[in-house]
Protein backbone atom coordinates (compact mmCIF):
# COMPACT_ATOMS: atom_id res chain seq x y z
CA UNK A 1 0.00 0.00 0.00
CA UNK A 2 1.42 3.33 -1.05
CA UNK A 3 1.95 5.67 1.86
CA UNK A 4 0.36 9.09 1.72
CA UNK A 5 2.92 11.66 2.80
CA UNK A 6 0.26 14.29 3.41
CA UNK A 7 -1.25 12.41 6.36
CA UNK A 8 -0.04 13.93 9.65
CA UNK A 9 2.39 12.05 11.83
CA UNK A 10 0.01 11.73 14.78
CA UNK A 11 -2.37 9.80 12.50
CA UNK A 12 0.24 7.54 10.91
CA UNK A 13 1.94 6.54 14.17
CA UNK A 14 0.43 3.62 16.02
CA UNK A 15 -0.27 4.06 19.73
CA UNK A 16 1.68 2.08 22.27
CA UNK A 17 -1.23 -0.18 23.21
CA UNK A 18 -1.77 -1.50 19.65
CA UNK A 19 -0.12 -4.85 19.17
CA UNK A 20 1.84 -5.52 16.01
CA UNK A 21 0.22 -8.19 13.85
CA UNK A 22 -0.42 -9.15 10.27
CA UNK A 23 -1.46 -5.65 9.30
CA UNK A 24 2.05 -4.25 9.60
CA UNK A 25 2.04 -3.61 5.87
CA UNK A 26 -0.93 -1.31 6.29
CA UNK A 27 0.41 1.79 8.01
CA UNK A 28 -3.15 2.86 8.83
CA UNK A 29 -4.27 -0.54 10.08
CA UNK A 30 -4.91 0.77 13.58
CA UNK A 31 -7.71 2.94 12.15
CA UNK A 32 -9.63 0.08 10.51
CA UNK A 33 -12.79 -1.26 12.08
CA UNK A 34 -11.76 -4.85 11.41
CA UNK A 35 -8.15 -6.06 11.34
CA UNK A 36 -6.98 -6.74 7.82
CA UNK A 37 -9.94 -4.94 6.28
CA UNK A 38 -7.82 -2.67 4.13
CA UNK A 39 -8.61 0.71 2.70
CA UNK A 40 -12.09 1.38 1.39
CA UNK A 41 -12.58 1.91 -2.31
CA UNK A 42 -14.17 5.29 -2.94
CA UNK A 43 -13.77 5.15 -6.71
CA UNK A 44 -17.44 4.14 -7.04
CA UNK A 45 -19.91 6.89 -6.18
CA UNK A 46 -21.84 5.96 -3.06
CA UNK A 47 -24.26 8.00 -1.00
CA UNK A 48 -25.38 7.06 2.46
CA UNK A 49 -24.54 3.75 4.12
CA UNK A 50 -23.89 0.77 1.80
CA UNK A 51 -26.10 2.13 -1.01
CA UNK A 52 -25.23 0.33 -4.21
CA UNK A 53 -25.72 2.45 -7.31
CA UNK A 54 -25.21 0.94 -10.72
CA UNK A 55 -23.87 3.32 -13.35
CA UNK A 56 -23.56 3.06 -17.10
CA UNK A 57 -21.52 5.14 -19.50
CA UNK A 58 -23.45 7.98 -21.11
CA UNK A 59 -22.71 10.80 -23.47
CA UNK A 60 -24.02 14.27 -24.22
CA UNK A 61 -23.21 16.82 -26.91
CA UNK A 62 -20.37 19.12 -25.95
CA UNK A 63 -21.01 22.83 -26.08
CA UNK A 64 -19.24 24.42 -29.02
CA UNK A 65 -19.77 26.35 -32.20
CA UNK A 66 -21.94 25.14 -35.02
CA UNK A 67 -20.63 24.46 -38.46
CA UNK A 68 -20.08 27.60 -40.50
CA UNK A 69 -20.08 29.87 -37.48
CA UNK A 70 -17.45 32.19 -36.01
CA UNK A 71 -14.56 30.37 -34.38
CA UNK A 72 -14.14 33.21 -31.88
CA UNK A 73 -17.63 33.74 -30.42
CA UNK A 74 -19.79 31.14 -32.16
CA UNK A 75 -22.15 33.67 -33.76
CA UNK A 76 -23.41 33.53 -37.32
CA UNK A 77 -20.63 35.49 -39.00
CA UNK A 78 -17.04 35.06 -40.09
CA UNK A 79 -14.13 35.36 -37.71
CA UNK A 80 -12.77 38.39 -39.60
CA UNK A 81 -16.05 40.24 -38.93
CA UNK A 82 -16.10 39.45 -35.19
CA UNK A 83 -15.99 42.48 -32.90
CA UNK A 84 -15.23 40.62 -29.65
CA UNK A 85 -11.81 40.19 -28.10
CA UNK A 86 -9.88 37.43 -29.84
CA UNK A 87 -9.76 34.17 -27.93
CA UNK A 88 -6.48 32.48 -27.16
CA UNK A 89 -7.96 29.17 -28.20
CA UNK A 90 -10.55 28.88 -30.93
CA UNK A 91 -13.90 27.34 -30.13
CA UNK A 92 -14.17 23.71 -31.10
CA UNK A 93 -16.63 22.14 -33.44
CA UNK A 94 -18.43 20.47 -30.56
CA UNK A 95 -18.61 16.76 -29.96
CA UNK A 96 -19.60 14.39 -27.22
CA UNK A 97 -18.45 14.15 -23.65
CA UNK A 98 -18.66 10.89 -21.73
CA UNK A 99 -19.92 10.59 -18.16
CA UNK A 100 -21.64 8.07 -15.93
CA UNK A 101 -25.37 7.96 -15.33
CA UNK A 102 -27.41 5.82 -12.99
CA UNK A 103 -28.89 2.70 -14.59
CA UNK A 104 -32.62 3.17 -14.14
CA UNK A 105 -33.93 1.31 -17.17
CA UNK A 106 -35.06 -1.75 -15.23
CA UNK A 107 -36.48 0.23 -12.28
CA UNK A 108 -40.12 0.95 -11.63
CA UNK A 109 -41.63 4.38 -11.06
CA UNK A 110 -41.31 4.10 -7.27
CA UNK A 111 -37.83 2.59 -7.37
CA UNK A 112 -36.47 5.49 -9.42
CA UNK A 113 -37.52 7.90 -6.68
CA UNK A 114 -36.40 5.68 -3.80
CA UNK A 115 -33.05 6.96 -2.58
CA UNK A 116 -32.53 3.80 -0.51
CA UNK A 117 -33.08 1.40 -3.40
CA UNK A 118 -30.65 -1.48 -3.19
CA UNK A 119 -29.96 -1.05 0.52
CA UNK A 120 -30.52 -4.03 2.78
CA UNK A 121 -30.33 -2.85 6.33
CA UNK A 122 -30.19 -5.55 8.99
CA UNK A 123 -30.37 -2.85 11.64
CA UNK A 124 -33.66 -1.40 10.36
CA UNK A 125 -35.88 -3.35 12.83
CA UNK A 126 -33.67 -2.34 15.75
CA UNK A 127 -33.82 1.33 14.73
CA UNK A 128 -37.60 1.19 14.38
CA UNK A 129 -37.96 -0.46 17.79
CA UNK A 130 -35.74 2.17 19.42
CA UNK A 131 -37.79 4.96 17.83
CA UNK A 132 -41.03 3.42 19.11
CA UNK A 133 -39.84 3.34 22.72
CA UNK A 134 -41.03 6.24 24.87
CA UNK A 135 -38.33 8.76 25.80
CA UNK A 136 -36.76 8.57 29.21
CA UNK A 137 -38.51 10.53 31.95
CA UNK A 138 -37.18 14.03 32.32
CA UNK A 139 -35.23 14.74 35.47
CA UNK A 140 -37.02 16.64 38.18
CA UNK A 141 -36.13 20.32 38.03
CA UNK A 142 -35.95 20.65 41.81
CA UNK A 143 -33.48 17.78 42.06
CA UNK A 144 -31.35 19.31 39.32
CA UNK A 145 -31.25 22.67 41.11
CA UNK A 146 -30.38 21.00 44.40
CA UNK A 147 -27.53 19.07 42.80
CA UNK A 148 -26.31 22.27 41.13
CA UNK A 149 -26.27 24.11 44.48
CA UNK A 150 -24.42 21.30 46.21
CA UNK A 151 -21.71 21.39 43.56
CA UNK A 152 -22.36 17.87 42.28
CA UNK A 153 -23.03 19.13 38.78
CA UNK A 154 -20.14 19.60 36.38
CA UNK A 155 -21.22 23.15 35.61
CA UNK A 156 -21.18 24.06 39.31
CA UNK A 157 -17.67 22.61 39.62
CA UNK A 158 -16.47 24.76 36.74
CA UNK A 159 -18.09 27.86 38.25
CA UNK A 160 -15.83 27.63 41.29
CA UNK A 161 -16.23 26.85 44.97
CA UNK A 162 -16.00 30.43 46.24
CA UNK A 163 -18.88 31.87 44.23
CA UNK A 164 -22.36 30.48 44.95
CA UNK A 165 -23.98 29.01 41.86
CA UNK A 166 -27.61 29.85 42.69
CA UNK A 167 -29.03 32.28 45.22
CA UNK A 168 -30.83 30.39 48.03
CA UNK A 169 -34.58 30.75 48.17
CA UNK A 170 -34.61 31.83 51.83
CA UNK A 171 -32.13 34.63 51.10
CA UNK A 172 -34.48 37.62 51.05
CA UNK A 173 -33.34 41.14 50.28
CA UNK A 174 -33.43 43.40 53.33
CA UNK A 175 -35.19 46.32 51.68
CA UNK A 176 -38.16 44.11 50.79
CA UNK A 177 -39.19 44.11 54.47
CA UNK A 178 -39.86 47.86 54.36
CA UNK A 179 -41.62 48.10 51.01
CA UNK A 180 -45.07 47.72 52.57
CA UNK A 181 -44.24 49.97 55.51
CA UNK A 182 -45.22 53.60 55.93
CA UNK A 183 -41.81 54.90 54.94
CA UNK A 184 -39.44 53.47 52.39
CA UNK A 185 -35.85 53.31 53.55
CA UNK A 186 -34.40 52.14 50.25
CA UNK A 187 -33.77 54.50 47.36
CA UNK A 188 -33.66 52.36 44.20
CA UNK A 189 -32.14 55.15 42.10
CA UNK A 190 -29.10 55.75 44.27
CA UNK A 191 -29.11 52.20 45.71
CA UNK A 192 -28.70 53.53 49.25
CA UNK A 193 -30.37 51.81 52.19
CA UNK A 194 -30.97 53.80 55.38
CA UNK A 195 -30.79 51.52 58.39
CA UNK A 196 -32.45 51.81 61.79
CA UNK A 197 -29.60 53.79 63.37
CA UNK A 198 -29.68 56.63 60.82
CA UNK A 199 -31.11 59.84 62.26
CA UNK A 200 -32.90 61.99 59.74
CA UNK A 201 -32.30 61.96 56.06
CA UNK A 202 -28.95 61.68 54.42
CA UNK A 203 -27.48 64.91 53.04
CA UNK A 204 -28.39 65.48 49.45
CA UNK A 205 -25.63 64.60 47.07
CA UNK A 206 -24.82 66.82 44.08
CA UNK A 207 -25.64 64.02 41.67
CA UNK A 208 -29.08 63.66 43.25
CA UNK A 209 -30.01 67.32 42.78
CA UNK A 210 -33.45 67.65 41.27
CA UNK A 211 -34.78 64.30 42.41
CA UNK A 212 -36.34 65.73 45.59
CA UNK A 213 -38.14 68.54 43.75
CA UNK A 214 -35.77 71.30 44.83
CA UNK A 215 -35.00 72.27 41.25
CA UNK A 216 -37.14 72.60 38.15
CA UNK A 217 -36.86 69.46 36.08
CA UNK A 218 -37.37 70.56 32.48
CA UNK A 219 -35.49 71.74 29.43
CA UNK A 220 -35.35 75.53 28.89
CA UNK A 221 -35.23 75.36 25.12
CA UNK A 222 -38.16 72.96 25.02
CA UNK A 223 -40.47 74.88 27.39
CA UNK A 224 -39.36 78.49 28.00
CA UNK A 225 -42.83 79.54 29.19
CA UNK A 226 -42.64 77.20 32.16
CA UNK A 227 -39.35 78.74 33.25
CA UNK A 228 -40.78 82.26 33.01
CA UNK A 229 -43.86 81.33 35.03
CA UNK A 230 -41.69 79.66 37.62
CA UNK A 231 -39.64 82.84 38.00
CA UNK A 232 -42.69 85.14 38.28
CA UNK A 233 -44.61 83.02 40.79
CA UNK A 234 -42.36 83.76 43.83
CA UNK A 235 -42.28 87.51 43.05
CA UNK A 236 -46.02 87.63 42.66
CA UNK A 237 -46.52 85.80 45.95
CA UNK A 238 -44.20 88.19 47.79
CA UNK A 239 -46.12 91.28 46.61
CA UNK A 240 -49.54 89.97 47.49
CA UNK A 241 -50.68 90.23 51.13
CA UNK A 242 -50.76 86.96 52.99
CA UNK A 243 -53.37 86.27 55.68
CA UNK A 244 -55.93 88.54 57.42
CA UNK A 245 -53.28 90.54 59.34
CA UNK A 246 -51.77 92.04 56.22
CA UNK A 247 -55.20 92.77 54.72
CA UNK A 248 -56.31 94.66 57.89
CA UNK A 249 -53.09 96.68 58.00
CA UNK A 250 -53.48 97.64 54.37
CA UNK A 251 -57.09 98.74 54.99
CA UNK A 252 -56.08 100.84 57.99
CA UNK A 253 -53.39 102.61 56.01
CA UNK A 254 -55.85 103.39 53.22
CA UNK A 255 -58.44 104.80 55.66
CA UNK A 256 -55.80 106.93 57.35
CA UNK A 257 -54.59 108.30 54.05
CA UNK A 258 -57.88 108.97 52.30
CA UNK A 259 -60.28 109.08 55.25
CA UNK A 260 -63.97 108.67 54.57
CA UNK A 261 -63.91 110.50 51.24
CA UNK A 262 -65.20 107.46 49.46
CA UNK A 263 -68.22 107.27 51.79
CA UNK A 264 -68.97 111.05 51.48
CA UNK A 265 -69.18 110.79 47.70
CA UNK A 266 -71.94 108.25 48.05
UniProtKB/Swiss-Prot annotation:
Basic and acidic residues biased stretches: 173-194
Biased composition (Low complexity): 195-207, 244-257
Keywords from the named record: Metal-binding, mRNA processing, mRNA splicing, Nucleus, Spliceosome, Zinc, Zinc-finger
Matches recorded under InterPro entries: Splicing_factor_SLU7
Region described as Disordered: 160-266
Zinc finger (CCHC-type): 68-84
GO biological process: mRNA splicing, via spliceosome
Highest rank taxon of the organism: Eukaryota
Key word Ubl conjugation present: no
Keyword RNA-binding included in the entry's annotation: no
One of the record's GO cellular component terms: spliceosomal complex
GO molecular function, one term: zinc ion binding
Principal cellular location given in the protein's record: nucleus
Cellular localisation: Nucleus
PANTHER family: PRE-MRNA-SPLICING FACTOR SLU7, STEP II SPLICING FACTOR SLU7
Subunit structure, interactors included: Associated with the spliceosome.
Function: Involved in pre-mRNA splicing.
Similarity comment: Belongs to the SLU7 family.
Name of protein: Pre-mRNA-splicing factor SLU7
Protein's organism: Eremothecium gossypii (strain ATCC 10895 / CBS 109.51 / FGSC 9923 / NRRL Y-1056) (Yeast)
Gene: SLU7
Amino acid sequence: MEENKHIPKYIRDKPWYVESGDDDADYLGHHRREPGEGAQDFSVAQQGSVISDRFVAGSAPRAGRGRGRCTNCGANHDRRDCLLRPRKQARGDGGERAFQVRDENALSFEAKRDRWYGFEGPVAPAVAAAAAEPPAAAEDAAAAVERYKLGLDARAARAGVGAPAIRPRHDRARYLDDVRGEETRYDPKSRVYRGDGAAGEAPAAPDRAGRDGSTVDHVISANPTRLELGRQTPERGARQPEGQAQSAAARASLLQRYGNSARSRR
